[in-house]
Amino acid sequence: MKYFIAFHGLCCIMKKIYGLFERMCYIMCKFIPKLIFFNGAELLEGPCWDAETESLYFVSIKADTVFRFNTKTGRIKSYATDGAVGCAVLRDGKLITAEKSGIYERKIDDTEKQLIAHVYDDNIYRYNDGKLDPKGRLFVGTMGDGERQTGKCGLYRIDGENEFTCVVSGTTISNGLGWTKDSSKMFFIDTPTKEVWEFDYDLETGEISNKKVFTKIEDGAPDGMCVDIDDTLWIAHWGGSKVSHWDSRTGEYLGEIELPVSRVSCPVVGGKMMDTLYITTALDPDGNEPLSGGLFAVKIR
């Protein structure tokens, strides 16, 4: 009997060890990014998830192209733009694109587009990252087109046709944006500062106030960003080969996802169960990273 009890106890211990090993393997596999799209793009950016069609929109800035990737079928559709395109977002069933010559709106799959607004007059600028706030207002940033325009760019709120407001001035490379679930906070990145800024946000007016530094990124520079349904931040590290994860309420660092490329540009949460992080990247100019410039996906829950 005592041998049976000892054997039974050993089996229980082995079962627990196996369970822990299985869990560790699951966690390790869960956070391994997989390449899901590659065409040698110089700079992929601005992923935007469309839950209705389970499709991902993203832009190839230097190729003047918007892509739509249907995650159910694997089919890709592309839209040509008028010069460099900084971002593409969906609103009321229409596609909004921030192109070199202006911000446009069009019906999905329609070639005709309507100019909404244009915030700069000089060709030394272009649009960069942009997103809709929880009320559907477009916020879009600017940067130098080719030559850096230090402190001369900004983040703009598009208030209507040919109506816009500069909400953050004096930026250099306006980048990541995101809002908390209750719309009380907005986060924003001006990449060269290496800082992620936090603002109080008034959803009714679209006004920001009480700027403070949420965190400073030391490994690479912060690029694109998103806020998930748990109010945590995912921040792309340009030159840092990863996406870091943060608690928006406490500022606590929660972990990171490493990628096989250095120039990580922007993440977005998507998938049928909102359990997948899609990550755009840019080409390695030295040619040492064969997967650079690809689109990656990784399960996060």
Label each region the model flagged.
Residues 269-301:
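Blade-level signature of beta-propeller repeat domains, shared across WD40, Kelch, NHL, RCC1
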Residues 39-53, 82-99, 121-141, 167-185, ...:
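Beta-rich, blade/repeat-based domains predominating
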Residues 65-67, 102, 154-156, 195-197, ...:
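A short loop-to-beta-strand structural motif that recurs across blades of beta-propeller domains
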Residues 205-269:
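Glycine/small-residue-rich hydrophobic helix-like segments
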Residues 199-206, 300-301:
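Short loop/turn segments immediately following beta-strands, especially the blade-tip
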Residues 28-40, 71, 211:
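A short helix->beta-strand "capping" segment at the edge of beta-propeller domains
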Residues 71, 91-93, 108-109, 156-163, ...:
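Flexible "stalk/tail and boundary" regions
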Residues 40, 51, 56-62, 95-101, ...:
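Conserved beta-strand positions in repeat-built beta-propeller and related beta-rich domains
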